[in-house]
Amino acid sequence: MGIGSRSSMMLAGALALGLSIPSLAADRQMERLTRGVAVTNVGSGVLVSWRLLGTDSPDTEFNLYRDGEKVASIGKTDGTNYLDASGTTTSKYTVAAVVNGKEGAKEGVSVVLDKTVSNSGKSFPYKTLKLEVPAAQTMPDGEKCTYTPNDMSTADLDGDGEYELILKWDPSNAHDNSQTGYTGTVFIDAYKLDGTRLWRIDLGKNIRAGAHYTQFQVFDYDGDGKAEMIVKTADGTIDGTGKAIGDKSKDYRDASGTILKGPEYLTVFRGVDGAAISTVTYEPSRDINQHVKGKDAHGYWGDNYGNRCERYLAATGYLDGVHPSAIFVRGYYSSSYVAAYDFDGKDLKLRWLHKSEYPGQGLYGEGNHSLQAVDLDGDGYDEIFFGAAALNHDGTLRYRTGLGHGDAHHIGDLDPDLPGLELWDVHEHTDAQYTEEMRAHDGKIIWGTPQPSSGGVDNGRGMAADVDSEYRGYEMWSAKGGGMKTAKGKLIGTPAVSQNFRIYFDGDEYDELLDGAYVTKFNSSSKKSEVYFDGPAALGATGCNGTKNTPSLVADLFGDWREELVVRSEKDPTLLYIVSTPVESKLRVYTLMHDATYRTAVASQNTAYNQPSHLGYYLPDMVKSLKQPAVVMAGEELAPPDTTPVVNNGKSELDASKPKEGDGFTESTNEGFLENGYFNFANSLSSYGTWEIFSQKEAKTTLTIRFTNGGTGDRNMSLNVNGKSAGTISFPSTGDWTKYSDATIDVKLEAGVNTLKFSSMTSDGGPNFDMFTFGIDGVELYDGTQTIDTSTTIATFVPFKTGVMFNPATGMLFTPKAGFAEVYFYDMAGNMRMGVSRNVPAGSTPMALDRDMLPKGMYVVKVKVDGKLMHAARMVK
């Protein structure tokens, strides 16, 4: 979506109705987690902590039991942790939520950190995982390589509500893309927190090892409660069940050890066993001449040895505002390609492909060694941060700054007094205007440090974190930026602070700094960093990725909101450490993993030059007024699979040459059309067409589209019917613009007015549309005069079993218990058009609604009780 379009419309509507402004974001699909009760050894007793889940009311109380006896009651504003001086790691703890004085089910322990190490005056709890190291390998040139643990991710792979760890093994001969040489095989393992290995995937000899090659995304993409892994594969990749992808006999390595030939794939692996589910061709291939006609042998990559074409990035984001999509990138030094994919449980489908192939345009040359999908402007859809440029959720260009490539970025509510999220970026190009800069959600530079007048510098490190309690907002600094600055750009000083990672590791609302396994705390009074945890000295732990010295993973894996540090042993590759906070916290904070900004950042943390995760809100403000996140658990409160039978017992033919609106034009230049011409979509990724049609009845039927495509390639389009995705349609080449063909897709029509929106998925735009044919009678183009027999048609489309019902025709709400009720009406574009809220008793209550204020059309009605979505229905007025 373009900047501000949805948010401005919804804001105006809310103000006109005199309502407080609700969140623009829809409820986002998240993992269904347990309480994650953690019992950790802190020397003098145990620290017990647990999650405040995104589905909990902010003032949920808790009872804590040890060996069946209650040892603590946790109040409405207390932190979800308790230091039990009399407890041990073998004690049996349970936690129960208490809502309105009623205790719920007790949940047991998820993880025990039974070990402790004394360091810097505190006892740090930790546990170790024993890993199965891949065997050493010998390369074709006789060189040998060994393995150490490298980057990691986390997700619930088996649906038990607990996180598993996904680990990439790094061979000792891994190479940068600019270097020649053979590399060992890349392996990816999955482990449960008790050390059980679930599977190992062997990416094979045709995938090279190095920081810029294998970017793996692990997330529950299909919403079945079990995560999948998506990663680039090739001939010879062996899945977790031992089955090969492609031809495992093929070896595409050349004499220098590089790989510039052979098919390239993108594969979805099942989380529970590592089985390959769906494999598609990686888009685009490394041969840029298939996409752009180069001026010489180098084409537009800028080299012919695989440096620029073999640089990959990956991220996960909510491109439709509700469900996660996977995003994969090829190239950022020159030509740049971004492909977004959706997974429906069976097939991996391309949502869109963005191409930036010409210098000075789009994403060309603007990429970082990192990628992040995040809702920058609060419109409910995730944008894609690329570096010095960004894309909108639909793959169109959001902005280009022209500042070029960079090595580090940070995104969060860096300045809580500004709208949206802000970005901190450092730049490698010595001719860039700034060496470091803070950027607004729309790409405008808020402030920056200009390059020195004596000559530009290559700024390779940068950090943003909220470390100084004296100043509101984050602090920012970089390797060559001249010191630490506030969110307003004020120079604080030049303290000796690390420029690597951040972590919540103590009990306050401010960041600690992390360099490998070394944690420091910034002293706001002395303006100096103080050692908080010396992991190398205490445990012999270390980071990975050479001089980058990043942790394998930092994430809120269990317990309360504090983060866990996952690092490897420097000397023993079989040993992995999970270290947690040593102290209590009075702060009540929702599990960080139910904040979408943070959760997707954890998913992309392993990408290339690992970047730390930040929250989508300003924590010091949040702890003062805790707000429940807008989330829905995977598999819960979502529309079920549509089993409506397809009806094709009639025929309705419609002229498709004139949509209600669109990016294109109606013409009759080329022969072969049947009625008044055809609609010619613009040749761009942003082209679309919207048609309003009227149906006399509700039915699921087949839509046949008569089209012509005189181009050389497929022109795929996505179809949304009444604001809901109906799928993707392939429009292959017909060979000539006067030759027509048919494409079909099943659509579900409501009785009354329906909106069909076709959106292009390639930069070539769409084909030419001539006719629509529906498989039922009584369908026609809507001209504003047709009406349906009844004034209101209601079709419940979310199978809630809550007992809450709302009748839009009468305004009557029924709730089985008393509570605070909210009723909102949304149009099919997602804009809130009307709303009302009040405290209601159990039983039937009239809600004061003036339906006459709504124009004719279709609406989604959502009902929340005590902050939870309890009922949803469609209404046609």
What does each model-found stretch correspond to?
Residues 788-818, 825-833, 855-856, 874-877:
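Surface-exposed, proline-anchored Ser/Thr-rich loop/turn motifs
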Residues 186, 191, 639-789:
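Extracytoplasmic
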Residues 30-34, 52, 77-643, 721:
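Beta-propeller-forming repeat regions
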